[in-house]
């Protein structure tokens, strides 16, 4: 059910916890606390291990562990240098040299240098379960040229290597070299390089993360602390954000003008275009009937034709999105990369057509054998698809519920499931799910989406994200994905993109629904400097995985 929001009087929660042993942070009554909501948690577990993205707290990367470089996606991946001051990629695209920033200290006062970078990458190499981005498939070795210069040797020519390299967290060698098992280490008292490293308060319902006393860029930091309240679901979030308790959020708000913006002139939002959202099916399903259905391309096409995408956008997202009728999932934001012949050839399979879906199912042998109103497989097996979305993700939950109803119209039996995110995610990693609704990364070009969503090299190994866990494999597709950045020539990349598009579209690997928006809300009551339509410096979200949030927080200043 969509949340029914009542407007309440604006209130500001004041945290009066005194700080001790941390002279660089003002007392709680005086300091500026930026209240953020990067992710839903049913309870907080004190885990600040930057290599454990599935279980850590989502203010760990960027804010505790600063990257070498932030590539600003909205500005064409323009590099903004952080722990590094420069990089240079070799003409043959087989190595990258990073010049590190001198004068940087870890939060405990120890000096940051090349040894920390070398250690961090070797740690991921020795412990592949810590490799969240697949960097081990790109980097063969790391060399120390001097105390502030590091060379990365690349396995194959890759013009995008710097972008991939900076995704790996850099941790202090002097701390982590004594950790026996980094894959289970929760890092409760972190030593970091970013702006907020000090855990001032921690409970299951609230933690406050305060300024690094040795932050190298402290002159540009005006926020004293991040305040992170525990929020379990969208309904709980809506109560807080409408009440004026939150400063920086990136969650779904139904009917945002009426429920949020109307509550206060200080309640602002900006929703720049974002990436693809789609239904993913499990090609490795252990159940014979479900496997027979899900691995049949005409069944996937009929599933796709059953979806009234515009209705889903209008109801589940209150109009916040664009229909994605590309069988490849490419989306109109990347239309300049599209082979329009391929797009049009398969567009009909990604357009709402109830009768067409029924005809395609019948042609493929899916008929109602037992007269229960739903189709059975061509071999006569009955099945019911369980379609999952994470609990509390109201827009996703409503999307799935609408899809279940629309699938029933063409004779496909399905039921919605809303497990906690960790359960949802694990089911995808272990191939124990039927169908899942997910969003995807959105980059400066389509490769980030396509590679993370379809490269079979990302379907195995601990720490891999969920996006390619449909377990569809195509060697030619993998080859094209892996060759995209072996050239820096845009015309050659366009030709490769057309080949990628053709394969994914022809096989209808996933069922794209829409191109979403970067949901972002901000409150001007307590802070100024927010990114918005008039100040579009970068992707504005507070989510982990958006490194631009580091640059964003440095632009914020408390209201005097």
What annotation goes with each model-predicted range?
Residues 80, 133-136, 320:
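Short, glycine-/polar-rich solvent-exposed loops and beta-turns at beta-strand/coil boundaries
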Residues 26-34:
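Cleaved targeting-peptide boundary
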Residues 513:
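Active-site-proximal polar cores
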Residues 1-27:
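Gram-negative bacterial Sec-dependent N-terminal signal peptides
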């Amino acid at each position: 059910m969509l949340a029914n929001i009542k407007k309440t009087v604006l209130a500001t929660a004041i945290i009066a916890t005194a700080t001790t042993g941390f002279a660089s942070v003002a007392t709680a009554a005086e300091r500026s606390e930026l209240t953020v909501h990067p992710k839903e948690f049913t309870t907080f577990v004190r885990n600040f291990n930057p290599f454990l993205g599935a279980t850590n707290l989502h203010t760990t990367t960027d804010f505790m562990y600063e990257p070498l470089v932030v590539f600003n996606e909205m500005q064409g991946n323009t590099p903004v240098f952080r722990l590094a001051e420069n990089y240079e990629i070799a003409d043959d695209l087989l190595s990258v040299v990073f010049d590190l920033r001198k004068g940087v200290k870890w939060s405990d006062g120890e000096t940051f240098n090349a040894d920390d970078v070398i250690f961090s990458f070797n740690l991921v190499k020795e412990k592949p379960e810590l490799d969240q981005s697949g960097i081990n498939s790109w980097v063969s070795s790391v060399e120390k040229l001097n105390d502030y210069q590091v060379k990365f040797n690349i396995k194959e020519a890759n013009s995008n290597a710097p972008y991939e390299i900076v995704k790996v967290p850099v941790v202090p060698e002097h701390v982590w070299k004594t950790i026996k098992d980094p894959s289970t280490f929760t890092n409760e008292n972190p030593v970091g390089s970013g702006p907020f490293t000090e855990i001032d308060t921690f409970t299951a319902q609230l933690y406050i993360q305060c300024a690094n006393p040795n932050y190298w860029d402290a002159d540009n930091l005006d926020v004293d602390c991040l305040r992170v309240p525990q929020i379990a679901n969208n309904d709980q979030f809506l109560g807080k954000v409408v009440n004026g308790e939150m400063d920086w959020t990136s969650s779904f708000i139904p009917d945002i003008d009426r429920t949020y913006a109307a509550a206060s002139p200080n309640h602002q939002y900006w929703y720049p275009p974002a990436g693809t959202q789609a239904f993913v099916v499990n090609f490795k399903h252990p159940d014979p009937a479900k496997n027979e259905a899900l691995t049949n391309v005409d069944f996937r096409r009929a599933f796709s034709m059953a979806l009234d995408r515009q209705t889903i956008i209008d109801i589940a997202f209150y109009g916040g999105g664009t229909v994605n009728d590309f069988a490849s999932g490419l989306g109109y934001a990347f239309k300049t990369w599209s082979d329009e012949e391929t797009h049009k050839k398969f567009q009909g399979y990604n357009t709402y057509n109830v009768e067409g879906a029924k005809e395609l199912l019948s042609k493929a042998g899916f008929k109602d054998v037992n007269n229960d109103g739903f189709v059975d497989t061509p071999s006569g097996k009955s099945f019911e698809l369980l379609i999952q979305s994470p609990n509390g993700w109201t827009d996703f939950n409503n999307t799935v519920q609408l899809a279940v109803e629309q699938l029933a119209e063409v004779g496909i039996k399905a039921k919605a499931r809303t497990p906690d995110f960790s359960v949802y995610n694990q089911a995808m990693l272990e191939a124990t799910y039927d169908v899942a609704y997910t969003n995807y990364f959105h980059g400066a070009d389509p490769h980030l989406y396509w590679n993370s969503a379809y490269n079979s090299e990302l379907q195995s190994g601990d720490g891999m994200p969920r996006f390619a866990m449909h377990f569809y494999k195509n060697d030619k597709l993998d080859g094209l994905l892996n060759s995209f950045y072996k050239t820096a020539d845009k015309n050659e990349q366009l030709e490769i993109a057309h080949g990628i598009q053709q394969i994914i579209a022809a096989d209808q690997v996933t069922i794209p629904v829409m191109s979403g928006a970067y949901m972002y809300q901000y409150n001007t009551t307590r802070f100024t400097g927010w990114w918005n339509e008039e100040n579009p410096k970068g992707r504005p979200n507070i989510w982990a995985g958006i490194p631009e949030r580091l640059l964003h927080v440095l632009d914020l200043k408390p209201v005097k």
